[in-house]
């Protein structure tokens, strides 16, 4: 199984996939985020955050006041399973996490916590 995926983000507030599939045989999984747009991160920055589906909007809401220096995530937010930094055009960042953090039967998702982006920039994380 390939235990990594690359997800691209754009100036049109979109990810290039709606689902990240993780093979149960993977001990760790790496997500690399790229940005193929042309806008800087303070204008059209994106990150990729993984959490339970039910926690996605609350994490994004709480992260608004944290600001870009903290990746628009509340300090020490235990609901966040993994996240990349906020990146701008031409940049990339990756994060590796233990697949054991994902429980069978629970619904997980990924999203961008940059203010206003979650409505268009989200998807599911599936354990296969």
Curated annotation (Swiss-Prot):
Keyword field contains Metal-binding: yes
Chief place where the protein resides: periplasm
PROSITE patterns, alphabetized: COPPER_BLUE
GO cellular component: periplasmic space
Binding residues for Cu cation: 46, 112, 117, 121
Keywords attached to this entry: Copper, Disulfide bond, Electron transport, Metal-binding, Periplasm, Transport
A Pfam family assignment: Copper-bind
Cystine residue pairs: 3-26
InterPro entries reported in the protein's UniProt record: Azurin, BlueCu_1, BlueCu_1_BS, Cu-binding_ET, Cupredoxin
A molecular function (GO) term: electron transfer activity
Compartments where found: Periplasm
Residue ranges of every copy of the Plastocyanin-like domain listed in the record: 1-128
Function as written in the Swiss-Prot or TrEMBL entry: Transfers electrons from cytochrome c551 to cytochrome oxidase.
Name recorded for this polypeptide: Azurin
Source taxonomy: Bacteria, Pseudomonadati, Pseudomonadota, Gammaproteobacteria, Pseudomonadales
